[in-house]
Structure formats: C-alpha cells, structure tokens
Amino acid sequence: MDMKKLIERINFLYKKSKEEGLTKEEKVEQQKLRREYIDIIKGNVKVQLEGVEKIPTPNRKN
C-alpha cells in the first residue's frame, strides 16, 4: 500500500474510533496498518543509518 493511502486509512480509522467506535474487523485492520507503518519507518531509518559513514577526526593535542 502506498504510504499516503496507508496514513489516510490509519487516520480515518482513528477518527472513526473516537466518533462512533470500530467493529472488530476494523480494529484488526487498524492494528495491521499501524504495524505496517511502523515497519516501513523502521526500514527507512535502518537504510539511512547504514548509509552513514564515520569520518575520522585528526588527533588533536590541547
């Protein structure tokens, strides 16, 4: 699922839960979508961190 649609659906289910409540199926869907979102974010952070290189600093005497 596209990230924008994923976030829109998560937000829709959140608002619906506050206004009228969710069915059992919608609660399961909400949990699944939230987990998918978290996994995507964690994957993105991991990729970014793997691309980071440590730059050695020269030894300084103060």
Curated annotation (Swiss-Prot):
Looking at the UniProt record for this protein, which Gene Ontology cellular component terms does it annotate, in alphabetical order?
Answer: cytoplasm
One Pfam family, short name: DUF896
Q: Which InterPro entries match?
A: DUF896
Q: Indicate where this protein resides in the cell.
A: Cytoplasm
UniProt KW keywords: Cytoplasm
Concerning its family, UniProt says: Belongs to the UPF0291 family.
According to UniProt, the name of this protein is UPF0291 protein CLD_1956
Q: Mind giving the lineage of the organism this protein is from? A: Bacteria, Bacillati, Bacillota, Clostridia, Eubacteriales
